[in-house]
């Protein structure tokens, strides 16, 4: 089995967003550098649904950039790559599908000590367990 966050990273790279894990895409940590990053983290979801073998998992995306415009633009680019109410089923990889829905749209989260801007949004992803 693969990891949901890695599979979402693979999907984003294929969509032209980000280049590689540990370069500008990260999981579960916000590194000090580079300045521009996309960070995916999983937090508490809901248990497996009876009869379908899938769980409603929760994923947070944090985008950091040097400017408000860049952070907002990148955040919305990631959001739009993952969220489409008319086509909610995403094939992240050949072996991983997910039904993606937004818990909220991208919003400014904070400005860090280096004056970099962070935007955040949260998703629900119904997908088989890892």
Predicted regions and their residues:
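Short C-terminal domain-edge/linker segments immediately following a structured domain
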Residues: 68-74, 90-95
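Surface-exposed, low-hydrophobicity beta-strand/loop segments enriched in small/polar/acidic residues
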Residues: 69-70, 76-84, 105
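Acidic-leaning, charged glycine-interspersed low-complexity segments
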Residues: 18, 83-130
């Amino acid at each position: 089995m693969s990891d949901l966050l890695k599979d979402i990273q693979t999907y984003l790279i294929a969509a032209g967003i980000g280049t590689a894990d540990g370069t500008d895409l990260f999981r579960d940590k916000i590194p000090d550098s580079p300045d521009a990053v996309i960070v995916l983290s999983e937090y508490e979801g809901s248990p497996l649904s009876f009869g379908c073998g899938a769980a409603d998992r929760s994923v947070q995306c944090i985008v950091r950039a040097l400017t408000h415009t860049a952070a907002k633009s990148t955040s919305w680019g990631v959001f739009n790559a993952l969220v489409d109410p008319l086509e909610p089923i995403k094939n992240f990889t050949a072996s991983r599908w997910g039904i993606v829905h937004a818990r909220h749209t991208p919003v400014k989260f904070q400005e860090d000590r280096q004056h970099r801007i962070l935007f955040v949004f949260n998703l629900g992803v119904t997908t088989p367990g890892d």
